Amino acid sequence: AIAAAPLTGIALGIAAAFVLWGTTSIGLNPYLAGLLTVGALALGTRGMHVDGLADSVDGLGCYGPPERAREVMHSGGAGPFGVAALFIFLGLQSVSFGVLAVADSPTQWIAVLVSVAAGRVAVVFACRRGILASSPSGFGALVADSQPLWAAIVWSVPLIVASAFATDRWWLGPLVTASALLISVLCVRHCVRRFGGLNGDVLGFALELTVTLTAVGLTLGL
């Protein structure tokens, strides 16, 4: 399932572009349209990834050993760090999609698709061989250490190629997308060290981080 995650990202990216186009076409404020698009993405994934984002940031924000960080992550509610992260990350996504919606460029919808798909490629990187689970149970145990590095690279190549068509500056899209994936890999490495391994929440964090960085970066090409 993880190996095919980018296919889900492509489907969700197309759906997001359609929602953004449809809502702005009927006259909705582009920033409200961006917010609705982000909400539709969260609804389409049952909020799993945004929940993982909040839990991971709460875990990173606490003191103590990995066991304590995992306890905070699994406490069942979003703490102040998690709430702030949701506000910042989802807010940046919404505003970025709003900016893309009003861009007078044929590349704007490709940028939405690339942003969403990039998050799923980041998940494949996060599950690459050598990254172990933080617990023998849970979703992380099912997917950690499961993907060869070449699988993530294979998905990265078409994504980066597509990103060249996501802005009017052909070089900017690949630079933004590759940078977002690299930052995600480094952040996952830190999370694995901080939490004592990979879990499902970290995947949500990696995904939302990459979507946010890519969407924000691609607005620079407008």
What are these model-predicted stretches?
Residues 1-46, 50, 57-70, 75-222:
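Hydrophobic alpha-helical transmembrane segments
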